């Protein structure tokens, strides 16, 4: 049963209402103008860190293979565009904003104080790039009847349905498009979101948003050290090497031999899961049991019975699971068989801490994000293996969705989604 049906979500009427509101907002907006200023952006990082930047143009979007930055935000939107031409206007506008924000520059001045400011001002007079990446993905719903794109939908893209341990909230699921915004500092991420919303009042409406972070040592290592999640375990140890281009072609990127629509080449399937942790319950669980559930030493990250984090577990010599339990997380997620090689994926998860639930429990957990060339062979296959794992007692997926990360922008004459919309 599809998620929207269970929760009675009426998407078309909601979009019409939001589009009317967006049109009113657009009437009060003003064109962008750039002015030269030398004021520095605030922040605790050194100027060198603030000036770090990722290339915007290329075969693939940044933010997928990019070493994880410290701060992250996931924002899903409903698209309010009325037709395909309107959708093209949206994608061109997003491309322009991403290009400016990720490369940095002087904040625009507002020549007429009776009009709204052209920039939020939260970064000061100069918008430093701050290692910002903004990755645009499209959801299953963008390929409905509105824009005539159904024949071009990626073959494995689908609506997220419930797994046995899920407790999905309709307000935290799906979206026509998804932005993954990452940077060295949270204020840069927030500034980027506000800039994008300001420029698209008649084209986008926020559906849901979650902000995340990774442990400081991992962010400063630029991908060399594994983040630690809020259960206290290293998260992403078994990730494939993102610096290995040949391996990434096999694991992450859609290629010409997959019988996918031609426009998808260079893109990637993205699975997003908002996973709530029962941290109070976990913190009262004995260390030995925690390690048995994960199959790893909590301090070193090494597979049980081994010494180092990146040691490869030897399941063949432990067929009964006496060292690493048969239902441990690492053993189910990656059994290390010839068959499981096809289900590799690149994880890019972040922790979140939101406040307190209605029941008085800490609301914190994991923003799970992974990329793969085939959603069914990747995330869906792995998640089916994990159904019933011992860790389920401590975690509860509450939202997310499946998306397709668009191929990159070739140059200044190109725009995100151009190959899709020109078909």
Curated annotation (Swiss-Prot):
Organism: Escherichia coli O6:H1 (strain CFT073 / ATCC 700928 / UPEC)
SUPFAM superfamilies with a match to the protein in the record: Dimeric alpha+beta barrel (SSF54909)
PANTHER family registered for this protein in UniProt: DEFERROCHELATASE (PTHR30521:SF4), DEFERROCHELATASE/PEROXIDASE (PTHR30521)
Keyword Signal: yes
An example Gene Ontology biological process: iron import into cell
Highest classification ranks of the organism: Bacteria, Pseudomonadati, Pseudomonadota, Gammaproteobacteria, Enterobacterales
Signal peptide (from-to): 1-35
Cell compartment(s), UniProt: Periplasm
Domain of life: Bacteria
Post-translational modifications: Predicted to be exported by the Tat system. The position of the signal peptide cleavage has not been experimentally proven.
Pfam family, one: Dyp_perox_N
Protein name listed in UniProt: Deferrochelatase
Protein role: Involved in the recovery of exogenous heme iron. Extracts iron from heme while preserving the protoporphyrin ring intact.
């Amino acid at each position: 049963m599809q998620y929207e049906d269970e929760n009675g979500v009426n998407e078309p009427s909601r979009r019409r209402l939001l589009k009317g509101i967006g049109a009113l907002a657009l009437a009060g907006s003003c064109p962008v103008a750039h002015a030269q200023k030398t004021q520095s952006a605030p922040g605790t990082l050194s100027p060198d860190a603030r000036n770090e930047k990722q290339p915007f143009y290329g075969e693939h979007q940044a933010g997928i293979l990019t070493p994880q930055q410290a701060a992250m935000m996931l924002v899903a939107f409903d698209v309010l565009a009325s037709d395909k031409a309107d959708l093209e206007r949206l994608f061109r506008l997003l491309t322009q904003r991403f290009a400016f924000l990720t490369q940095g520059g002087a904040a625009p001045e507002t020549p007429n104080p009776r009009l709204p400011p052209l920039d939020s001002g939260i970064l000061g007079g100069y918008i430093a790039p701050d290692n910002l990446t903004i990755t645009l993905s499209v959801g299953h719903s963008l390929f409905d009847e509105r824009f005539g794109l159904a024949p071009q939908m990626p073959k494995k893209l689908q609506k997220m349905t419930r797994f046995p341990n899920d407790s999905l909230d309709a307000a935290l699921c799906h979206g026509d498009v998804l932005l993954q915004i990452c940077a060295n500092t949270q204020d840069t991420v927030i500034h980027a979101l506000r800039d994008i919303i300001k420029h698209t009042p008649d084209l986008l409406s926020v559906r849901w948003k979650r902000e995340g972070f990774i442990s400081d040592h991992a962010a400063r290592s630029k991908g060399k050290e594994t983040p630690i999640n809020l259960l206290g375990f290293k998260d992403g140890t078994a990730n494939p090497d993102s610096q290995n281009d040949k391996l990434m072609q096999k694991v992450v990127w859609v290629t010409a031999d997959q019988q996918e629509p031609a426009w998808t080449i260079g893109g990637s399937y993205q699975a997003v899961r908002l996973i709530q942790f029962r941290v109070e319950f976990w913190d009262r669980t004995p260390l030995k049991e925690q390690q048995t559930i994960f199959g790893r030493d909590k301090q070193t990250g090494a597979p049980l019975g081994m010494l180092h984090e990146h040691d490869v577990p030897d399941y063949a010599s432990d067929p009964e699971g006496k060292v690493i339990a048969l239902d441990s997380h690492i053993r189910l997620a990656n059994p290390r068989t010839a068959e499981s090689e096809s289900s590799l994926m690149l994880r890019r998860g972040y922790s979140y801490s939101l406040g307190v639930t209605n029941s008085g429990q800490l609301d914190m957990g994991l923003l799970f994000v992974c990329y793969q060339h085939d959603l069914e062979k990747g995330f869906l296959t792995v998640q089916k293996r994990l159904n019933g794992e011992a860790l389920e007692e401590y975690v509860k997926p509450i939202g997310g969705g499946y998306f397709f990360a668009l191929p990159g922008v070739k140059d200044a004459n190109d725009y995100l989604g151009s190959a899709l919309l020109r078909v």
